[in-house]
From Swiss-Prot:
Subcellular location: Cytoplasm
InterPro entries found in the cross-reference section: RNA_pol_Rpo13 (IPR021985)
Documented EC number(s): 2.7.7.6
Record protein name field: DNA-directed RNA polymerase subunit Rpo13
Subunit structure: Part of the 13-subunit RNA polymerase complex.
Superkingdom of this protein's organism: Archaea
Length: 104
């Protein structure tokens, strides 16, 4: 106890630091993952069902492969639409920024 703090105070300081570190870890982990749409969640559920059926022997490997490919094709269609929408919205935002900078 050279620092002048009692052992209880030292323990509280340590636990407060640990809580702060845990909060920082939680915040960064939430930022790392993209937001999932309902369609994305449904796709994940379908893929999980395919794996479940495959592992339980209800479908063959070839059937599972075909189902995964079908799901992926459907996902690609949705993803390409999303990218197109983002590209259009970015162009609009850039135009607005340019107009503001010209006026200002």
């Amino acid at each position: 106890m050279v620092s002048g703090m009692s052992t209880d105070e030292e323990k509280e300081g340590t636990s407060d630091e640990e809580v702060n570190e845990e909060k920082e870890v939680e915040e960064t982990s939430e930022d790392e993952f993209p937001k999932l749409s309902i369609q994305d969640i449904e796709l994940l559920m379908r893929n999980t069902e395919i794996w479940d059926n495959l592992l339980n022997g209800k479908i063959t490997l070839e059937e599972a492969k075909k189902l995964f490919e079908d799901n992926y094709k459907e996902y690609e269609k949705r993803d390409s639409r999303r990218k197109a929408k983002k590209a259009v919205s970015k162009k609009v935002k850039k135009t607005k920024k340019k107009e503001k900078s010209v006026e200002g």
